[in-house]
Amino acid sequence: MSQSKNGSSQCLWTSICIVVLVMSMARGAVSTNYAEALQKSLLYFEAQRSGKLPPNQKVTWRGDSALKDGSDAHIDLTGGYYDAGDNMKFGFPLAFTTTMLAWSNIEMGSELRAHHEQGNSLRALKWATDYLIKAHPQPNVLYGQVGEGNSDHKCWMRPEDMTTPRTSYRIDAQHPGSDLAGETAAAMAAASIAFAPFDKAYANILIGHAKDLFAFAKAHPGLYQNSITNAGGFYASSGYEDELLWAAAWLHRATNDQIYLNYLTQASGTGGPRSVFAWDDKFVGAQVLMAKLALERKVGSNGKIAEYKSMAEQFICNCAQKGSNNVKKTPGGLLYFLPWNNLQYTTTASFVLSAYSKYLTKAKASIQCPKGALQASDLLQIARSQVDYILGSNPQKMSYMVGVGTNYPKKPHHRAASIVSIRKDKTPVTCSGGYDKWYNNPAPNPNVLMGALVGGPNENDVYGDERSNFQQAEPATVTVAPFVGVLAAVF
């Protein structure tokens, strides 16, 4: 009897030890996965670089490209990022990418530093802001696109030896674009905050551009695609009110100047309840920044400020499945917004949850949703669940970040990655030849696009790993930029 009881006790203790060990190993694996994903998410931006590559370039299968950008307008427009799987520089999504990279550095700076990625993250940000500075040569002039979308998309070529037109397009007082100017102002203002602790002079340059761009956007209202018509078929803007609020919120945070807060409180509306936060809809971003001010008690939390906060928290409640109009979830648990590149919306929503979790923690506050309360820890856990899904905890057992894990997309829709590196084979790739030899090639891409996030699975958790499946298989900078911050937050 005694022996049996002792044996049972030993068996129980052994079982507990095994469970604890397995759980510990699982946590270690997840933690390592987060570290790998964070590192590779920043490598992705190196693969998207346009222009003269620096000596410390780590993605060595890429080469210099588009070294004459801007020459048609007698201006240097080299640098910046290609937006997705093509060879285009679209200023509207590029500016949003920049703002989200900056926000990641601002809110998760200490985490990025702890994970030894702050330097890489700031370098990714500066590659974008250096270009945006070039693109804004005069207060009321902003270059918003390089390349022609239609001709670029008709060809499947490497950026290093592409022969498609590199036309420079701009907005100015006679050809306005409040949305483009407003988003670029937001990017410059946010980046100025990120760089201020390290390079005050550079931060001051950025804030000067941000102020000029915001003034330009207000003084000369208009949709940018009416001036840069070529952009309309690719990144058309649905309005510019959100960009102006977003820019004002960032300028207020960067300068603490009352005139920007006045703009926000005197605006005709706060954007109302939103269903997404993305490159064409920044209302949620502005609402969250204003809610932060209210939580910090830096402004009165009634009237217009209270409305911003209410709208921000309504979006969060819906993402947490505790709202009145909840975001759809796939059977596997992914927040599902829209079919085309759904992960761009998942990563921005996850960023909002991660950032707001920090705001609530600092304020010792919670959110009262229609279907229950949310604590700061709840928000971070939801964000972590989305990261885990994206990195492989899903019905497909697939990581949707290229190069992370063993089962990840092998054929993302991406010209540079799908064609042999110019460093290995300098034979020119022609417009149609690229389609014949590389686009239609059933083999995996010859270059691994480390850290890229594809568009992701459909509403039933199904993903098709084919280059032709661009709605699911094309990565974009707007998807990865917020994910940098989320990865740092959930680590």
Swiss-Prot record:
Record GO cellular component, one term: extracellular region
Glycosylated sites: N6
Catalytic activity field: Endohydrolysis of (1->4)-beta-D-glucosidic linkages in cellulose, lichenin and cereal beta-D-glucans
InterPro entries on file: 6-hairpin_glycosidase_sf, 6hp_glycosidase-like_sf, Glyco_hydro_9, Glyco_hydro_9_His_AS
Keywords: Carbohydrate metabolism, Cell wall biogenesis/degradation, Cellulose degradation, Glycoprotein, Glycosidase, Hydrolase, Polysaccharide degradation, Secreted, Signal
The keyword rRNA processing appears for this protein: no
Leading EC class: hydrolase
Protein's GO biological process: cell wall organization; cellulose catabolic process
Entry's Gene Ontology molecular function annotations: cellulase activity
Active site residues per record: D86, H413, D465, E474
Cellular localisation: Secreted
Superkingdom of origin: Eukaryota
Keyword set includes Secreted: yes
Catalytic activity, EC: 3.2.1.4
One protein family per Pfam: Glyco_hydro_9
PANTHER family (alphabetical): ENDO-1,4-BETA-GLUCANASE
Family the entry assigns: Belongs to the glycosyl hydrolase 9 (cellulase E) family.
Protein name from the UniProt record: Endoglucanase 12
